[in-house]
Regions:
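Predominantly flavin-linked oxidoreductase catalytic cores and closely associated redox partners
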Residues: 113-114, 121-270
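N-terminal Rossmann-like FAD-binding beta1-loop-alpha1 element of flavoenzymes
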Residues: 6-33, 369-374
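Redox-cofactor binding/interface segments in oxidoreductases and associated redox assembly factors
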Residues: 11, 45, 155-160, 343
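Residue-level recognition of phosphate/Mg2+-coordinating polar/acidic sites
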Residues: 27, 59-61, 79, 85-103, ...
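Conserved N-terminal/central alpha/beta ligand/cofactor-binding core
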Residues: 41-127, 132
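A conserved FAD-binding loop/helix module that cradles the flavin
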Residues: 162-163, 349-376
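Hydrophobic anchor at the start of a short beta-strand
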Residues: 8, 29-32, 97, 157, ...
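Glycine-rich FAD pyrophosphate-binding loop
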Residues: 25-48
Length: 376
């Protein structure tokens, strides 16, 4: 009976769209998934190809703190579908998981491809329509949906498409899309491959690993910073404390009087970085380092300045921007402007840090929308 009462279209066959389809199909509804590309293709590169499904944070308010945009909106969402529910979902789908020490949750297969195949197996009854949706027009008792090839009519629409794929015909406010979770271009290009552990960003009050690349900086800390500072105009400066642990540089100098400064600093940092940090004093013996030089090096360590000139958009995995959260009901994911129209996952102006948080948003909002459609 349900499938005859409702005709449901999901626009976007990414993580949120496919999981929404899973719950709707499970409840007996017929679902049409629109996407010009292969379903779940964006899942394949996640977690470095290993698919970081979620993060082991089980308090919904603490979990929501990992989203620079969307924290309060997600309180209601995560209270309905938490990390516990995500683990139960993937167990149901036949995906076994494990948790790393840093809290990141992965499939035991360490394969995004394996996760994709299992999800698609469970939504095989959906109608996959390989067309791009260009316009949605509200009609009596539903919506006309226009693609690049044809026109369709559905009683319920779920928008689950992200990036710059704007759909015409609706009066929703869409926040412009900007790169998030990307590497940052700097004028430091000689340290490619160097990794510094537990670096503290003084500007953003965050601690994580920092990777130097051929274009500048990357890795977890750079991604978090890029997500927070999406609206900052280039160029801007960042300041880092490279080593927050207590240490006595003068004591190290006294204990190693005949060692070069670069070799002494190599006991704290990777050798190439120690040499870079030492600068013109790299080969000066410790016993010749005076107080002024010592303080100069200490200031570099605890106030390391980097000039940010842009983002490395070729590395882009997540965008900030999307449908304005003020126009979406977080308890149902239904539009406040149009009945029976839902907006989820990648389409929302929500972005999370690295570590499985963006996929958690996809699973949770996909479930909440499906639950609302089922109960409506």
């Amino acid at each position: 009976m349900r499938s005859k009462c409702k005709t449901i279209s999901i626009i976007g066959a990414g993580a949120s769209g496919c999981i929404c389809a899973y719950f709707l199909l499970k409840a007996g509804f017929e679902v049409s998934l629109f996407d010009y590309g292969s379903p779940l293709r964006t899942l394949l590169p996640t977690g470095g190809g290993r698919c970081n499904l979620a993060h082991a944070e089980y308090d919904f308010k603490e979990l929501a703190k990992n989203y620079p945009r969307g924290e309060k909106f997600l309180y209601s969402v995560f209270s309905k579908f938490s990390t516990y529910d995500t683990l139960a979902l993937f167990e149901e789908l036949g995906v076994e998981t494990y948790t790393q020490e840093n809290g990141r949750i992965f499939p035991t297969s360490n394969s995004s491809k394996d996760v994709r195949e299992k999800v698609l197996k469970h939504i095989s009854k959906a109608q996959f329509i390989k067309e791009g949706v260009t316009e949605i027009t509200p009609k009596e008792n539903g919506y006309k949906l226009k693609t690049d090839k044809a026109e369709y009519f559905f009683s319920d629409i779920v928008i689950a498409v992200g990036g710059n794929k704007i759909i015409n015909g609706l009066n929703h406010t869409v926040i412009p899309f900007t790169p998030a979770l990307v590497g940052l271009n700097t004028d430091i290009t000689t340290l490619s491959g160097v990794v510094l552990k537990d670096v503290y960003s003084i500007d953003c009050k965050l601690t994580d690993d920092l990777l130097f690349t051929h274009f500048g900086i990357s890795g977890p800390l750079a991604y978090k910073i890029s997500s927070i500072k999406t609206k900052d105009a280039f160029p801007y400066k960042l300041c880092f404390d490279l080593y927050k642990k207590e240490f006595d540089l003068q004591k190290l100098l006294n204990e190693n009087p005949h060692k070069d400064l670069k070799n002494i600093l190599s006991s704290i940092f990777p050798h190439r970085f120690a040499e870079y940090l030492s600068g013109e004093y790299a080969e000066v013996k410790a016993h010749k380092i005076d107080g002024k030089t010592r303080d100069l090096i200490l200031n570099k360590i605890h106030n390391f300045e980097v000039n940010i000139t842009g983002t490395n958009n070729g590395e882009e995995t997540v965008t900030a921007g999307g449908y304005d959260l003020n126009e979406v009901n977080p308890k149902t994911m239904e539009s406040k402007l149009y009945p029976n129209l839902y907006i989820i996952g990648e389409a929302l102006n929500i972005d999370g840090f690295c570590g499985g948080f963006n996929l958690q948003n996809a699973w949770s909002t996909g479930f909440v929308a499906a639950e609302s459609i089922i109960n409506n």
